[in-house]
């Protein structure tokens, strides 16, 4: 299949620039895999589509304020570091802009010198390996000095950092939010629990590769970025219990989905596990664990719309997207959602 098979027309004004004041008041397109029926609802109506005994799987990763603005010690030139992957307590793989200002041995200061850094090596892809120097807890320093790295298609400044975090986020490590989860409120989660729906949490730290375009014509030639995931025994037991009792496993977002499908065996069972995944799901893939999917509306020609197409069918997915454009749904990270059942 070619990347152009996943293209669609999207007017720029439909790209949501800021979140809604009330998270669960966004729109929800409900798609029925068996009948092809399309319904238009509000996100909090999701509670009516889930049954007691179902298991909803959410990604509890938290977005790091991973964008740091530093000053080079010798020239005082400004430079931006984006933290991509932690190597150890002091060393990170980073994306640097402009790269020409960050050569091996160059040193940088952040804030009033609370944080210092030195470039120790440069990868083939141009990413810099940087060793930081600091006293105290790195995450606390990052909270003070760092900024949330918003996706490139969001042009407006985000006044409240927490609006780009899910209400259940706790495991810091992502470069981007698992955006399907942004629609849930504490109240909605409580309603689901009261109905007897089980909520299970896993972690997948979203990398910046999620925004990288597919640059090959043939999608099978695309090399997927790898991301760290972790699933506890408690979560695995809840998912397996739902499967064994004939209930549905509902993935909230593509990140939960990729984790579940990485861990799942041929019988749809999962186990406690952590590691790195570079799973690339596109049409032809047979889902093992995920029965239903909640996800936002994604970029044209992205690996995410390919994942959705593998779940719902390419033509069905593109039809749903065309309906969403016609009905003026809001797209991407701060946009509306779809529920495929």
Swiss-Prot record:
Organism of origin: Clostridium kluyveri (strain ATCC 8527 / DSM 555 / NBRC 12016 / NCIMB 10680 / K1)
GO BP of this protein: queuosine biosynthetic process; tRNA wobble guanine modification
Top-tier EC class: transferase
Coiled coil: none
Principal subcellular localization: cytoplasm
Protein name stated in the entry: S-adenosylmethionine:tRNA ribosyltransferase-isomerase
InterPro entries, per the entry: QueA, QueA_dom1, QueA_dom2, QueA_sf
Pathway info: tRNA modification; tRNA-queuosine biosynthesis
Disulfide bonds: none
Catalytic activity line of the entry: 7-aminomethyl-7-carbaguanosine(34) in tRNA + S-adenosyl-L-methionine = epoxyqueuosine(34) in tRNA + adenine + L-methionine + 2 H(+)
NCBIfam families, per the entry: PRK00147.1, queA
GO cellular component terms, A-Z: cytoplasm
